[in-house]
Amino acid sequence: MQSRAYALISEAALHHNLSGLSARAGTRLLLPVKANAYGHGLELIARQAAAHPDVWGLAVATPREAQAVALLNLGRPVVLLTPPTPDEVVPLADLGVRLPVSSLEEAEALPVHARAHLKVDTGMNRLGARPDEAIRIGQRLAERGVLEGAYTHFATTDEEDLSFAHEQLRRFRSVIAALPPVLAHCANGGGILSLGHLGDMGLSRPGLASYGFAPAHLQRVVPLTPVMTLRATVTQVHKAFAGESVSYGGLWQAPRDTTLATIGFGYADGYPRNATLRAHVLVRGERRPVVGRICMDQCMVDVTGLEVRAGDQVECWGSGDLTVSEVAGWGDTIEYEVLTGLGERVERVAVP
């Protein structure tokens, strides 16, 4: 059975973005594939990324994600960015997953065959050890022969004021300087685009930027192409007569006799319900409004004057004039939330 909505995932666009970001950073990449690869499909993106020479490894947020990627046997290291539970440490180490460490207790608990990445809190106040303590932990990991990397996370590199980002970088470098050589990584996508070359780091971790998106003031730094195009199937074409209402609540009434196409994509699939009465889609390359309230499984589009039939495809977002950024704006949210909220009913399809 075919899906009513599907996401085309462009390997060419992904590789284009990865090449540009790696060149800008002056490092190889540790590509975040957490949250189902930002909604793009974990296995699909992991396989596409592993084929790119600038990708050193793949970063995940949960032990289950780490296990899933490790079992693909792609020949790229898998780095877990958030703490596992004590009973998960050995099974993950057995799979070769690189483990985060932010306390002496965690450092001592690692098996001898583990590879650790020291987590340093330079100001995000989310995870990690503060710099002074991180140095002690890192030195102990080095003594045990399990220290491979060290990392931190920038809090403000998407902003125009980079003063705090520079302070975080200074703090992180003070830790790195006190340790034996490690694979250091700190730059997210915003960090790569705003701070530029960080060749003293071994790796960079561009998330959303790898999938084609950047803050407005940074969009010209590295040309990026959205990796995903979202298409949905027309399930019915019918008439609404002048004055009739469409969808729940009667929020929209037809100003004239109107041809409507119902498409199989709704808020259960990830289309923001808050985009009601603002959203548009592309029908045969032409922008057409989504009318009435967006439903759980479908929505209705004004296609008056166009030749449309059941089974046709419409584009809900892509790499052209109608992007996820615009959809997120209609939904009063951000690209991250739209992409990671894309439901499992939406089939991910690899394209060249």
From Swiss-Prot:
A single MF term (Gene Ontology): pyridoxal phosphate binding
Record keywords: Isomerase, Pyridoxal phosphate
Q: Where are the transmembrane segments?
A: none
PROSITE patterns for the chain: ALANINE_RACEMASE (PS00395)
Chemical reaction(s) catalysed: L-alanine = D-alanine
Identify the enzyme class.
Answer: isomerase
Question: Could you give a single Gene Ontology term from the biological process aspect?
Answer: D-alanine biosynthetic process
Question: Isomerase: is it a keyword of this entry?
Answer: yes
Q: Which residues carry this modification: N6-(pyridoxal phosphate)lysine?
A: 34
Q: Could you name the active-site residues?
A: 34 (proton acceptor), 248 (proton acceptor)
Q: Which pathway, metabolic or otherwise, does it act in?
A: Amino-acid biosynthesis; D-alanine biosynthesis; D-alanine from L-alanine: step 1/1
| Entry EC no(s) | 5.1.1.1
Cofactor dependence is on:
pyridoxal 5'-phosphate
Q: Does the keyword Methyltransferase apply?
A: no
Q: Name one GO cellular component term.
A: cytosol
Report the SMART domains cross-referenced here: Ala_racemase_C
InterPro entries named in the record:
Ala_racemase, Ala_racemase/Decarboxylase_C, Ala_racemase_C, Ala_racemase_N, Ala_racemase_pyridoxalP-BS, PLP-binding_barrel
Positions bound to substrate: 126, 296
Membership in a protein family: Belongs to the alanine racemase family.
Q: Tell me, what does this protein do in biology?
A: Catalyzes the interconversion of L-alanine and D-alanine. May also act on other amino acids.
Task: Report what the protein is called.
Answer: Alanine racemase
Query: Gene name on record?
Result: alr
